Structure formats: structure tokens, C-alpha cells
């Protein structure tokens, strides 16, 4: 079941071929002037240049063939050879009926699905998420949903930052602060003889009493500042990090507690944001792979000594800029950040063997990923092109710089979500919405409106661009906003409820009015928007479609009465258009990670 653009492209391709020209010139696109035509084909101009012929003559040949297509009410030439096409009401009605009868409202599945792993969010142990995690989380979640909806076998991995120097900082700071834990750590350099699972449970229970999430939130920032001012503390933290990574028993137990406490809190925040993961693989999961991987890189002749460190050179002939080598082992003998990333690629190949791994990470990390990916290709851990960084810009304040609190600090993600929720409550009351809801229902609706405001404000932009945070604008029920889309969704549900209560039923779609045509054309455009979003790993194409669809329904509803339609047949047709619009709109919203309430 092809959309109109694709099926007309096939017809135009056949027409060009019949005219003795390559079929690829028959590409059809949505019209730049929808007041004049539904679709256009500019292939005659390119074909003329290739064949050294007059473009208008070519267009005449193609149009003469296309005029026999029963789906087209008109095919005309404009200017030097542009071909304009208008679809007949009958063909558009038939296409609308196809979409209405399809559970996916016209969205197709891939002919050749792939295994895809998406690495996104990147939360860290003992560090509350901040606004910088917002874009990674919601863009990654949307891309994951989009790829899964298209038919790919997709795994989303949080890539948990649970290893490295910050762990040594925490261990050292807590041992300084709590004499009991300090003494316990001194007693447990390794598992004592006869140390049972019950003994371990007692130790973990003691940690739960003594170290809460609030403690981690307090201790880590202080330790981070302290290591910059206290060389002795910094050295102890480095030693603790090395001993943890080498398997010191007590440190491993304490580390597990840090991970457990942090993950519970992080999952709660992600749930509030409508984000979930299939995997919570941590950097620690590849720790045991690093040493054999380094030996393997050495055996392949890829490791090079450089001022005491060991590196992999990744520069290529023809590079237009310097591409730095991958630092694998430091001069002190430590594995580096990029080493862990390389080992993670190796681990993913062994455990999942994906055709594609996408990294949804800040655009500022582009150079790092270029280096890591090239090293992975050299080592044979991935096929060329199987690793892709889908970068994004920053969310900025009114000054155009990355968003901060009024005090100049980094805003926690939890606080940002609460700000959006509070503003949504205010907006609902201002608009007189939700008055008939219970307190619990009102809070749930406010949460959905607030999250929709944050998500749509972000996802309506191409991910590579930055945007200015403006909560007043984002939470408005008017304009291009998430709350506007939710309002239109709830409005359609209300129309359908009233229709059901009156006994009205949906029926065969017949298109006659301009507003009906416009709505049906947009329903048909869903597949094209999905294809564009999929190819470019860019949810903004889905967001744009959702907004245009909501706008088109609003105009349709104003111009084409449903319940007071002149005939029962007309009412049934318009009810089907309303039902189909709702289903497609909610599919698009779900791909953006936005949930619509039932009532407002």
C-alpha cells in the first residue's frame, strides 16, 4: 500500500522511460504551491540537461502519457517544464479509505529490517541528571521508537557511567566521613574466608542505612571540588579507583550500593520523562574485556608507543583536518575513556551483533567519536559505516548560552520537569481546562502537558540545531507547541464520544470539500514524514507532520460540520476522517514519546 507520492513517482518514472529517458527523472514531490497542485515533478529540467533537449518538449511528452492516469484530475506544465499534478477526489477518497482501514494509518514496514542498538542518555552514578541530559534522553527515545515502528530490531542502552575516577572520589570521601565504613573497608580488602551471602546482605543493609541518594548528591560535588585543592586526597582517590577496578572486595560492595541507589533514582526520573531502556549496561561491564582487547590490538600491530602511552593512529590519507589518535593506555598504565568506548563496541558486537550502532550524544563529542569509530574499523570490531554519532545542539537560555539557573548553576532535570508541570497546571487553569477532572486526573494531565511541552519544544527542531528555552511559549495551548497537539487530540476524542453517544457511526470516506482534501492529503503524507525522519535520524519530521495534521483537522472541523452534516452518509465519512486523524496523530505523538490524556 504505497502513498500517493510514491505511486505517482512510479507512474512518472514509467512515463519518462516511455519517452526514452531514464526513469529516475520521474521523482514526484509534494507541491511547493498546494493552491495550484498536489504534487509536482521537476525531472524534465534535469532530463533536458542530460539529453541536451528542450525541457518543455520533454514535459509535453511525459504529460501526454500521464494524462491517461485515472488517479489524476489534471496534469499541467508550468514555466519551463515543471509538471503539476492534482489528484482526483475519487483517487483521494480511495486512498483515505485505505489509510482508515490500516492499523498503521498508511505507515509502511521496512522490507529489510536491521538489528540496531541506540546508545543514549548516558546517566552517571551519584550525579543527578541535569538539563544537559534532556536532549540526549528524548531524542534517543524518539529515534528508538521510530526505528522500532519501522520494523527494525532495536535495543536501547542507557550506557550507565558507573566506572572511573568518580567512584574513587566517592569511596575516599565516604571513608573520610564515616569511621564505621572506613573500618569496614580496611577489613575487607578481599572476601574473608567463609563470607556468606547472608554476611554480604548485612553489609549491604548497613550501606543502605548509612549512605542515601541525598548523601551521594552532597558528597560527590564536594569531593570533586576537594580533589582540585587537595593533592593527597586526589592521589587516594586515584588509588581507590585502581583498587576498585582490580577487584578489591569491600570497594566492589560499596560500588554496588552506589550503583543500586543511583539507578533507582534515575529510573524514577526517566519514567517521569517517558523514557525507558532495554539495557542498563555500565562502563564496568566491559572492564574485563579491556586487558585482552589491548593485547589483541597489540597483536594486530595497531598499538604504537608514544611518549610512554600507547595509542592507535587513525588519521587517513586525504583527511582535511587533523584526526587525533585514540589514547588506549596512558603513560601511567590506565585505560582511558576512549578505551572503554572501544571495548563497548566489541562487547556489543559479541552480544548483539548489530548492523548499526547509533550514539545520541552532544554534537561537541563528534571528534571523540570519529576517533573511536575509526579505531573500531581498523580493529575489525565493526564494519565501515556501522557506527554513527547522531549529535545534537544545546538548549540555551535567553542569552544564547547553554541554559543555567538564575544563580548561574546547572539546573537539575528533576527540577526542570517540575517547573514544566507547575506551568502546565497554571496554563490549564487559565484556559478553564480540567475543571471536571478529579485531583488525581488533573495532576496526571498537568504532568502530560508539561512533558509534552518540553519534548515537542525540543523535537520540533532538527537535532543538530540549538534552541532557546522559553517555558511560557512551550506551554501555550496556541501555536506550534506540545500542549496544542494534546488539546487537538482531546478535542477529537470529545467529538467521537459525542458521536458514539448519539448513535452515529463512521462509514465510507468520500472527499468533496477543500478542507476534506487537505486533511486527506496530510494523512497520506505520514509515510513520507516517517521515511525522512528515519533516513536522517531526525524526529523533527514527525513533529512537523503531527503539527500540520492537528492544524488541518482544526480547519476541517471548522469548515465541515460532522454531527450536523447534511446527510448521514456525509456524517459517516467525516467521522471516519476524524477517527483516522486521531489514530495517526496519536501514533506520531507516541513516536515523539508524548502521551495524550483522555480528557482535558
UniProtKB/Swiss-Prot annotation:
SUPFAM superfamilies: Anticodon-binding domain of a subclass of class I aminoacyl-tRNA synthetases, Arginyl-tRNA synthetase (ArgRS), N-terminal 'additional' domain, Nucleotidylyl transferase
Keywords: Aminoacyl-tRNA synthetase, ATP-binding, Cytoplasm, Ligase, Nucleotide-binding, Protein biosynthesis
Recorded name of the encoding gene: argS
Subunit-level organization: Monomer.
Compartments it resides in: Cytoplasm
Enzyme class, first EC level, given as a word: ligase
Organism: Caulobacter vibrioides (strain NA1000 / CB15N)
Entry protein name: Arginine--tRNA ligase
Catalytic reactions of this protein: tRNA(Arg) + L-arginine + ATP = L-arginyl-tRNA(Arg) + AMP + diphosphate
One term under GO cellular component: cytoplasm
GO biological process: arginyl-tRNA aminoacylation
CDD domains, per the entry: ArgRS_core
NCBIfam families named in the record: argS
Family matches, as Pfam families: Arg_tRNA_synt_N, DALR_1, tRNA-synt_1d
Ranges spanned by the short sequence motif 'HIGH' region, renumbered to the chain: 123-133
Keyword set includes Ubl conjugation: no
Family of the protein in this entry: Belongs to the class-I aminoacyl-tRNA synthetase family.
GO molecular function, one term: arginine-tRNA ligase activity
Amino acid at each position: 500500500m504505497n502513498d500517493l507520492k510514491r505511486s505517482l513517482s512510479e507512474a512518472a518514472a514509467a512515463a519518462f522511460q516511455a519517452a526514452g529517458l531514464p526513469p529516475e527523472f520521474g521523482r514526484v514531490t509534494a507541491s511547493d504551491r498546494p493552491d495550484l497542485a498536489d504534487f509536482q515533478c521537476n525531472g524534465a529540467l534535469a532530463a533536458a540537461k542530460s539529453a541536451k533537449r528542450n525541457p518543455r518538449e520533454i514535459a509535453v511528452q511525459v504529460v501526454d502519457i500521464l494524462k491517461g492516469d485515472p488517479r489524476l484530475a489534471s496534469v499541467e506544465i508550468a514555466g519551463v517544464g515543471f509538471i503539476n499534478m492534482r489528484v482526483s477526489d475519487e483517487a483521494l477518497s480511495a486512498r483515505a479509505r485505505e489509510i482508515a482501514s490500516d492499523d498503521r494509518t498508511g505507515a509502511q514496514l521496512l522490507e529489510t529490517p536491521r538489528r540496531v542498538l541506540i546508545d543514549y542518555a548516558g546517566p552517571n552514578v551519584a550525579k543527578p541528571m541535569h538539563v544537559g541530559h534532556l536532549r540526549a534522553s528524548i531524542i534517543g527515545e524518539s529515534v528508538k521508537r521510530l526505528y522500532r515502528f519501522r520494523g527494525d530490531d532495536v535495543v536501547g542502552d542507557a550506557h550507565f557511567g558507573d566506572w572511573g575516577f568518580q567512584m574513587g572520589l566517592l569511596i575516599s570521601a565516604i571513608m573520610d566521613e564515616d569511621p564505621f565504613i572506613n573500618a569496614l573497608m580496611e577489613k575487607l580488602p578481599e572476601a574473608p574466608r567463609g563470607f556468606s551471602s547472608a554476611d554480604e546482605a548485612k553489609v549491604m543493609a548497613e550501606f543502605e542505612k548509612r549512605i542515601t541518594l541525598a548523601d551521594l548528591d552532597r558528597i560527590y560535588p564536594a569531593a570533586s571540588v576537594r580533589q582540585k585543592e587537595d593533592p593527597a586526597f586526589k592521589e587516594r582517590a586515584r588509588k581507590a579507583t585502581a583498587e576498585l577496578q582490580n577487584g578489591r572486595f569491600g570497594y566492589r560492595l560499596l560500588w554496588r550500593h552506589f550503583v543500586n541507589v543511583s539507578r533507582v533514582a534515575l529510573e524514577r526520573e526517566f519514567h517521569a520523562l517517558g523514557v525507558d531502556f532495554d539495557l542498563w549496561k555500565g562502563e564496568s561491564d566491559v572492564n574485563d574485556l579491556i586487558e585482552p582487547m589491548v593485547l589483541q590490538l597489540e597483536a594486530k600491530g595497531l598499538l604504537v608507543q608514544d611518549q610512554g602511552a600507547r595509542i592507535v593512529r587513525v588519521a587517513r590519507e586525504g583527511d582535511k583536518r587533523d584526526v587525533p589518535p585514540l589514547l588506549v593506555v596512558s603513560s601511567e598504565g590506565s585505560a582511558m575513556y576512549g578505551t572503554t568506548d572501544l571495548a563497548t563496541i566489541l562487547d556489543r558486537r559479541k552480544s548483539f551483533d548489530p548492523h548499526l550502532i547509533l550514539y545520541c550524544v552532544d554534537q561537541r563529542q563528534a571528534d571523540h567519536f570519529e576517533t573511536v569509530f575509526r579505531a573500531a574499523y581498523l580493529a575489525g570490531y565493526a564494519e565501515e559505516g556501522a557506527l554513527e554519532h547522531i549529535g545534537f545542539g544545546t538548549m540555551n537560555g535567553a542569552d544564547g548560552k547553554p541554559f543555567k539557573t538564575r544563580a548561574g548553576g546547572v539546573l537539575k532535570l528533576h527540577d526542570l520537569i517540575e517547573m514544566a508541570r507547575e506551568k502546565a497546571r497554571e496554563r490549564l487553569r487559565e484556559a478553564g481546562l480540567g475543571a471536571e477532572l478529579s485531583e488525581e486526573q488533573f495532576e496526571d494531565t498537568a504532568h502530560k502537558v508539561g512533558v509534552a511541552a518540553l519534548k515537542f519544544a525540543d523535537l520540533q527542531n532538527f537535532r543538530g540545531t540549538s534552541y532557546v528555552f522559553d517555558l511560557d511559549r512551550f506551554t501555550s495551548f496556541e501555536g506550534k507547541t506540545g500542549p496544542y497537539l494534546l488539546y487537538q487530540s482531546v478535542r477529537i476524542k470529545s467529538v467521537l464520544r459525542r458521536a458514539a453517544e448519539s448513535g452515529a457511526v463512521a462509514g465510507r470516506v468520500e472527499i468533496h470539500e477543500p478542507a476534506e482534501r487537505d486533511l486527506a492529503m496530510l494523512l497520506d503524507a505520514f509515510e513520507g514524514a516517517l521515511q525522512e525522519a528515519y533516513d536522517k535520524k531526525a524526529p523533527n519530521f514527525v513533529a512537523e507532520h503531527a503539527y500540520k495534521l492537528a492544524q488541518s483537522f482544526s480547519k476541517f472541523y471548522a469548515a465541515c460540520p460532522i454531527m450536523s452534516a447534511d446527510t448521514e452518509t456525509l456524517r459517516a465519512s467525516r467521522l471516519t476522517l476524524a477517527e483516522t486523524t486521531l489514530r495517526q496523530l496519536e501514533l506520531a505523538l507516541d513516536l515523539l514519546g508524548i502521551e495524550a490524556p483522555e480528557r482535558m
